[in-house]
Amino acid sequence: MGQKVNPIGLRVGINRTWDSRWFADETYAKLLHQDLKLRKYLREKLAQAGVSRVVIERPAKKARITIHTARPGVVIGKKGADIEVLRKELSKMTGSEVHLNIVEIRKPELDAQLVAESIAQQLERRVAFRRAMKRAVQSAMRLGAQGIRINCSGRLGGAEIARMEWYREGRVPLHTLRADVDYGVGTAHTTYGSCGVKVWVFKGEILAHDPMAQDKRAAGETAPAGR
């Protein structure tokens, strides 16, 4: 089962926390749609900023949005001008006061979502898929990952028949629930069709069964860089 299921969903409540943290009664569906809309908007608006995660909290009719990004300078802008414009746009979309936090990802090479998007962008630029995969694996292992696996599927290199290629280094224990396995997905839209990229990064084991363990570990790697 661990081979098939999304590794993040399987570990929620064990060593991962939810990306949407709020409680609602009859407005649940409306707020859920709003979350999806906000995430889609932020990913499109901040496509060049390397956004990995968007955490949404809703305390007392407000919204607190935390953006995990590899390039906080792109989000914040000159003298904080861009972040203020972004905050106003999000307030208009939610109809409530929005607090924005920007968290810098110090090691983007170890973030599965950013690695997947990077490989997808390289495939769109016609970089050889084996070279892109190998480079990503070497960078992750050099920066301290205990294991990484990358799957690329589709008409790789413009081949007539679609296929799936994978590359792995180290160990990626998908069945071990205490294992801190990060997972990311990207799609490359090439002239031959779409190619899917999946990335699993194993960063070590979290022994304490603490729902905040993921955030505690992330706090050591990342540093806040915004308001």
UniProtKB/Swiss-Prot annotation:
A cellular component term, taken from the record's GO annotations: cytosolic small ribosomal subunit
Family annotation (Pfam families): KH_2, Ribosomal_S3_C
Keyword terms, alphabetized: Ribonucleoprotein, Ribosomal protein, RNA-binding, rRNA-binding
Domain KH type-2: 38-106
GO biological process terms held by the UniProt record: translation
Record keyword Manganese present: no
UniProt GO MF annotations: mRNA binding; rRNA binding; structural constituent of ribosome
Function, in words: Binds the lower part of the 30S subunit head. Binds mRNA in the 70S ribosome, positioning it for translation.
Quaternary structure, from the entry: Part of the 30S ribosomal subunit. Forms a tight complex with proteins S10 and S14.
NCBIfam families given in the database record: rpsC_bact
Family: Belongs to the universal ribosomal protein uS3 family.
UniProt-recorded name of the protein: Small ribosomal subunit protein uS3
Gene: rpsC
